[in-house]
From Swiss-Prot:
Stated induction or repression of this protein's expression: Up-regulated by methyl jasmonate.
Transmembrane segments: none
Protein name: (+)-sabinene synthase, chloroplastic
Residues where Mg(2+) 1 binds: D378, D382
UniProt gene name: TPS-sab
């Protein structure tokens, strides 16, 4: 049993960094606060722990449970040393010039009806152009042009799909599948019945046994389309099974190429665990090796040039924001909390992986800080805190008064101050964007979240295993999705009036589904480690309790089925044609769900961030692209 060692804490060393940048720029506003961190009688409590142990004894004789996790991977000195030349105005001017040139390419496509574009492939060229700018992460510059292109394509859409060009009578699987996916994602009404027309007499998608590049392209786009299925769309389920099988078999026979790399990426990341910036980084490499799209090389090169430049310009922004986050983490006293998982850099990678808009610094930084606080609370309630301490902390959060720290144990005082100041500062930032006070709204969400944590701590303390229904109802709240999303999205320059917020946040179906996916997927990746730490309750164990005789494999199959069904429901809530809430208002919440799904794709990449998650940080945040 390891013993908590006592390390002196220098006087006034715990400083509180301003928790926010403004919406449009980073500001280094610092405010000192006293004795922040995990402090006991003027000293910092440092837990010395081995990954093979589950308990530790503190200096006051309290036996505490500890987690199995590695320390922070990213040294602050390293982060502060990062630099990039791409913040210079000359690069922004070059990007502006390229944006104008790409708009000219779009404009040439819009003249198709006038005969300047070939009537045999103009529809495919419109779709390929939109697909490319979106996957390259530069679509924010061309929203008007994208709408013109999609309106044009949609004007030729039929119940049998479309051909590659406006004068082509026979519909084409490749163009139809690509069009279906892009049109649905942009809110156009399209039905999956179009794919029935590509089946043979046996009810299967008609294709030859040969793995030609053209046929693979068609099946690849069919697979991508199948991933945005709505509930009850059987033809989409069939298309996903068929196309996934076809692509996996094709990968075994075709040589390694840009095509095979694209296939592997789409199979690996699909849609609900795909991070836009990772896709951009990967697709730039793929296009650079000549991809399977139908555009002319001159256009590809122009798009690539802009995409690389934009990637590196944002890379310079990432470095500045990383420095801000790392300073905040260090000066908040968080390093003294050695019993928690320090994943602030990993969370920033997720935030910048789903939002590459330069002016959205406040969103990215808010998301990271809230996720860090969620981690602190998770590790206190799950492992380190005693029941008496947790009840005191829960009561203090409900009263929401800085003076409440006087009733808390020393190590909790700093945590409470960070939480209190962060939530209040985010509310002030949200007021700038939304024009109203949202603090009480955020506090209610936080109280609900803390209450769910306390209930789980009580279950652990009692050794109680709830029913699946009881566990899942509470687990959707304790997943943290709502609390990680709410305040960050309110800092955006997107209006969230009360009626729209209620369609995204609690008690909306959209919020429930996003929380459900995180709870279900998280449990499938964490239940064994949680069980080893003494936490009985998980979706897996509760399912097995409700279904005597069932195995872990049975439970996992059931949970994975629930996840697939829930993803389809979330697709519907985001993209439903009768939606009164714009897709843009729901997109950040939806993308946060994708980011968390990505984190748990193979394992608990949150607790164990030294493998795939570390590679993600390097590939999308630390490394610039060669120009």
């Amino acid at each position: 049993m390891s013993v908590i060692s006592i390390v002196p804490l220098a006087s006034n060393s715990c400083l509180y960094k301003s928790l926010m940048s403004s919406t449009h720029e980073l500001k280094a506003l610092c405010r000192p606060i006293a004795t922040l961190g995990m402090c006991r009688r003027g000293k910092s409590v440092m837990a010395s722990m081995s990954t093979s142990l589950t308990t530790a004894v503190s200096d006051d004789g309290v036996q505490r449970r500890i987690g199995h996790h590695h320390s922070n991977l990213w040294d602050d000195n390293f982060i502060q040393s990062l630099s990039s030349p791409y913040g210079a105005s000359s690069y922004a001017e070059s990007a502006k010039k390229l944006i104008g040139e790409v708009k000219e390419i779009f404009n040439s496509l819009s003249m198709a009806a006038g005969g300047l574009m070939s009537p045999v492939d103009d529809l495919l060229q419109h779709l390929s152009m939109v697909d490319n700018v979106e996957r390259l992460g530069i679509d924010r510059h061309f929203q008007t042009e994208i709408k013109v292109s999609l309106d044009y394509v949609y004007s030729y859409w039929s119940e049998k799909g479309i051909g590659s060009g406006r004068d082509i009578v026979c519909t084409d699987l490749n163009t139809t599948a690509l069009g279906f996916r892009i049109l649905r994602l942009h809110g156009y009404t399209v039905f999956p019945d179009v794919f029935e027309h590509f089946k043979d007499q046996m009810g299967r998608i008609a294709c030859s046994a040969n793995h030609t590049e053209r046929q693979i392209s068609s099946i690849l786009n069919l697979f991508r389309a199948s991933l945005i299925a709505f509930p009850g769309e059987k033809v989409m389920e069939e298309a996903e099974i068929f196309s996934a099988t076809y692509l996996k078999e094709a990968l075994q026979t075709i040589p390694v190429s840009s095509l095979s790399q694209e296939m592997q990426y789409v199979l690996d990341y699909r849609w609900h665990s795909n991070l836009p910036r990772l896709e951009t980084r990967t697709y730039i490499d793929i296009l650079g090796e000549t991809t399977i799209n139908q555009m002319q090389d001159v256009n590809i090169q122009k798009l690539l040039e802009l995409a690389k430049l934009e990637f590196n310009i944002f890379h310079s922004i990432q470095q500045n924001e990383l420095k801000c986050i790392s300073r905040w983490w260090k000066e908040s006293g968080s390093p003294e909390l050695t019993f928690i998982r320090h994943r602030h850099i990993e969370f920033y990678t997720l935030a910048s992986g789903i939002d590459m808009e330069p002016k959205h610094s406040a969103f990215r930084l808010s998301f990271v800080k809230m996720c860090h606080l969620i981690t602190v609370l998770d590790d206190i309630y799950d492992t380190f805190g005693t029941m008496d301490e947790l009840r005191l902390f829960t009561s203090a959060v409900k009263r929401w008064d800085r003076s409440e720290i006087e009733c808390l144990p020393e190590y909790m005082k700093g945590v409470y101050i960070i939480l209190y100041e962060t939530v209040n500062e985010m509310a002030r930032e949200a007021r700038k964007s939304q024009g109203r006070d949202t603090l009480n709204y955020a506090r209610l969400a936080l109280e609900e979240y803390i209450g769910a944590y306390l209930k789980e701590a009580e279950w652990i303390s009692m050794g109680y295993l709830p029913t699946f229904e009881e566990y899942f109802k509470n687990g959707k709240v304790s997943s943290g999705h709502r609390i990680a999303t709410l305040q960050p999205i309110l800092t955006l320059d997107i209006p969230f009036p009360h009626h729209i917020l209620q369609e995204i946040d609690f008690p909306s179906k959209f919020n429930e589904l996003a929380c459900s996916i995180l709870r279900l997927r998280g449990d499938t990746r964490c239940y064994q480690a949680d069980r080893d730490r003494g936490e009985k309750a998980s979706c897996i164990s509760c399912y097995m309790k409700d279904n005597p005789g069932s195995t872990e494999e049975d439970a996992l199959n059931h949970i994975n089925g629930m996840i697939e069904d829930t993803i389809k429901q979330l697709n519907w809530e985001l993209l439903r044609p009768d939606n009164n809430v714009p897709i843009s208002s729901k997109k950040h919440s939806f993308d946060i769900s994708r980011a968390f799904h990505h984190l748990y794709r193979y394992r608990d990449g949150y607790t164990v961030s030294s493998n795939e998650t570390k590679n993600l940080v390097v590939r999308t945040v630390l490394e610039p692209l060669p120009m």
